[in-house]
Every structure is written in C-alpha cells, then in structure tokens.
Swiss-Prot record:
Pathway membership, UniProt: Metabolic intermediate biosynthesis; chorismate biosynthesis; chorismate from D-erythrose 4-phosphate and phosphoenolpyruvate: step 3/7
Superkingdom in the source lineage: Archaea
Positions of the catalytic residues: 116 (proton donor/acceptor), 142 (schiff-base intermediate with substrate)
Enzyme class: lyase
A GO MF term: 3-dehydroquinate dehydratase activity
Residues given in the record as 3-dehydroquinate binding sites: 29-31, 56, 180, 200, 204
Quaternary structure and partners: Homodimer.
HAMAP family associated with the record: AroD (MF_00214)
Function (record text): Involved in the third step of the chorismate pathway, which leads to the biosynthesis of aromatic amino acids. Catalyzes the cis-dehydration of 3-dehydroquinate (DHQ) and introduces the first double bond of the aromatic ring to yield 3-dehydroshikimate.
PANTHER family from the UniProt entry: 3-DEHYDROQUINATE DEHYDRATASE
Pfam family, one: DHquinase_I
Name of the protein this chain belongs to: 3-dehydroquinate dehydratase
One GO process term, biological-process aspect: 3,4-dihydroxybenzoate biosynthetic process
C-alpha cells in the first residue's frame, strides 16, 4: 500500500486533499496535529475515508502542543468511528488504555504503535526490542528512524523482513529512501510517499516516482 500524508491546516482543505490523493494512493494519513482547529465531529468525517488518523504529540516530533487528554479523546473518537487505523506513540503512557477501549467497544480500528528517532537508527537488536514491545500492545509496529549509513538501511530492512504484515519500517532522510522503496517488498504493510513536494517526513519519495520505480523493478 502507498499512503499519502495529508498535511493541511484546515479541515476543509484536508478533506479536499484526501479525496484527490485517494485517486492515486491506497490510503491517506490525516495529520490532525497540523490542523489549526479540529473537533470530534471532524474526526467522524475523516474516519469515513481509508485512512490513518494521527494526532502526533510535539514530544514525538509532531505539532500537537495542547492538552494530552483532548488529544487522546480525538483518538478515541476515531476508534469509535471505526477508522481503518489510528497511530499511537509507543511512549504514550495511555496507549494500552486506548487498545483496551477499542476492544471493549468492539471497534474494527487497527492500532499502530509508533516509535520515532529523528537523529539516528538504533542497533538491529534495539529495533527488534522496540517492535516486540509495540506488538505486545497494538496490532502493528511502526518505527521511523534516521538512516545515516548503509548499515542502518540493511538493519531496517532486516527487521521489516522479520515481521511481515505486522510492521511499518522506515528509514528517514536521503540515505533512508531505499527503505521507503523496498520496505513493502520486505513485509512493511505500507510506505509513505509525497505528492508534488508535500511531505510529512524527510526522505519521502514522490508517489509518481515511487510507482515508476516499482514498475521497473516489477514490485507491487
């Protein structure tokens, strides 16, 4: 799957962009933390689309600086509305409570437990530890770490290969682009692409370029 991040500052623009993106991508990620204003009713609108709903906290590289309970309530609303995926940080102390809430109400939402490091990629052993911890909490483990070397790229792909269908593994930055191109081949459930320069993280490959590379390599 190819996911395009929706990085708009208003609900109206976000919905319009998502509809355009879904003509060329499999799924979108609504970056709720980048919106100037958002309500639970807006979350209900977003959840109708094939999407990941992410309200990324500022302490994990996001833009949400408001009340954390309000943030968690928006995620709960997405779960109530059966959003396809929600993303919750591994470092969020209440991530298990959100999974329990999902189970109690019988929601169909899949929960991604995510880890980010914008400076480096940990050792392969540490990455495995992170993935195991994330999978003990949610349905899918996601890690996005800065790739600074060929070794980082190899470690990321090896860890993805160990957990096919249960993981989203990403090497950020220019050196990490190979992980974005080959990650799905090794078992990542999706890769994040950019659209005409609009991206949510360093190193995202333009969707048209990504599709052309996959076509040339006979990857799907």
């Amino acid at each position: 799957m190819i996911c395009l991040p929706v990085v708009e500052d208003s609900v109206e623009k976000a919905i319009k962009t998502a509809e355009k993106y879904l003509e060329i991508a499999d799924i979108v990620e609504f970056r709720i933390d980048m919106l100037k204003e958002v309500s639970e009713e807006d979350i209900e609108k977003f959840a109708k689309y094939p999407c990941i709903i992410t309200v990324r906290a500022d302490w994990e590289g996001g833009y949400w600086k408001g009340n954390n309970e309000e943030r968690l309530n928006l995620i709960k609303k997405a779960i109530e509305c059966n959003a396809k995926f929600v993303d919750i940080e591994l470092r969020e102390e209440k991530n298990k409570e959100l999974v329990k809430f999902r189970d109690e109400i019988g929601s169909k939402t899949k929960i991604i437990i995510s880890y980010h490091d914008f400076e480096k990629t940990p050792s392969k052993e540490k990455l495995v530890e992170i993935v195991e911890k994330a999978l003990s909490i949610g349905d899918i483990a996601k890690f996005a770490t800065m790739a600074n070397s060929k070794e980082d790229v190899l470690n990321i792909l090896e860890v993805i290969n160990k957990y096919p269908g249960k993981i989203i593994g990403i090497g950020m930055g220019e050196k990490g682009k190979l992980t974005r191109i080959l990650g799905v081949y090794f078992g990542s459930i999706l890769t994040f692409a950019s659209y005409k320069g609009k991206s949510s993280a360093p190193g995202q490959v333009d969707i048209d370029t990504l599709k052309e590379i996959w076509r040339l390599m006979d990857l799907k």
